[in-house]
Amino acid sequence: MSNFAQGQWFVLRRSQTIPSLGLLAVLVTTCLVTDLLARNRSLERWTMAEITEFAIANGTLFSNTGNFIDFEDRVLLDEIPHADYSRGGIYFFGTSNMKWAFTKWDLPTDLQRFIGNYGIGASDHTTQLRLIRYLIAQRGFLTAGEKDLVILGVSFHLAHIDDPSTDYFGSLLRRHGLYTTTSDGNIVPVPMSALDRWLRIEKARSGGFFWNIGRVAKSWLVAHAGLAHGPLPGLFGTPDRLRGFMGGEHWQQNMDAQVQQLRETISLVRSHHAEVKVMLLPQGTWMDQLPYRARYESLIRALCQSTLTPLIDLSRSMPDNDFVDSNHMTVEGQEKFRGLIMEEILGHLHEAGIY
């Protein structure tokens, strides 16, 4: 190749490389800026405050997602990995009516660190037991012993039949490739490098950041365009659909099996010298027309009596108009509920000498 041809080839390659490097620099910078914004706690609090106000205005459900796509992503990818369980605290477990029962993002930071709301949507007592086992085995949960208080928020929904094809928690664990379950149902992290894990978490955080900006925009549009339908308290779904959700003709046997899982959960927590209480969560009066509530609550009372487990009965503590749908509370309802349990929270933290 002549010197002239070599020179032309070099100029061509340089003319291609510089724009490519420039584009790469723009992409990297965009990703870094997005991640920095997504990790900004002040911006996160502003987003949650805006979504809260629009939830009040539109009469919709508020979910504390932080800068993630949903509540559970925030808990699994951000809150739990940064939790310090060595000092003790108070931790709530349950299904969706527990996770959306109260918020803590607007509490003082030094109080937030001792409170965990680990509700998982569409879960049952088996899922709660597996989650607690994971936290103990992988995260050092309950290492503070008597300084820990676990409150199991319960309702008959935790005794439903989980359809494997629509297993929300299983799909949640697999969503980012960070967790999996063993053949016996234990939750374990997928082996990978620290860098790979960090990149996956930050990708989830950045995606959630854009998702929540979209939530703010959509909520603003609904509020200002008069499209809000307001709360829709009342029974959701037909009796047949609810019966299928609870296990069809075998709903009683399934309920018994799930309550047994709750018994095992209580035993597990106590084996680590932690305190445990059961809380019957608020229910609308429309639940009285179903056979599930009365039987489930009867089983829970018997279980608490036989295991000497304190029972906090808040099942009828909220009026129907504090529900946004059949089973979840409005923002005003969440604030009232937090007021009801704050004495329990502060009482334990003061007694344990950690707040």
PLM regions with names:
Residues 127-130, 190-197, 208, 257, ...:
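Extracytoplasmic/secreted proteins, especially bacterial periplasmic and envelope-associated proteins
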Residues 1-88:
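N-terminal secretory targeting modules
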Residues 154, 163-272:
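Secreted/periplasmic serine-hydrolase-like ester/acetyl group-modifying domain
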Residues 92, 117-122, 248-255, 288-290, ...:
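Second-shell loop/turn segments in exported
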Residues 108, 269, 303-304:
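A generic structural signal for well-ordered alpha-helical segments
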Residues 86-182:
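Membrane-embedded segments
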Residues 276-327, 331:
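Extended hydrophobic/aromatic segments used for targeting, binding, or gating
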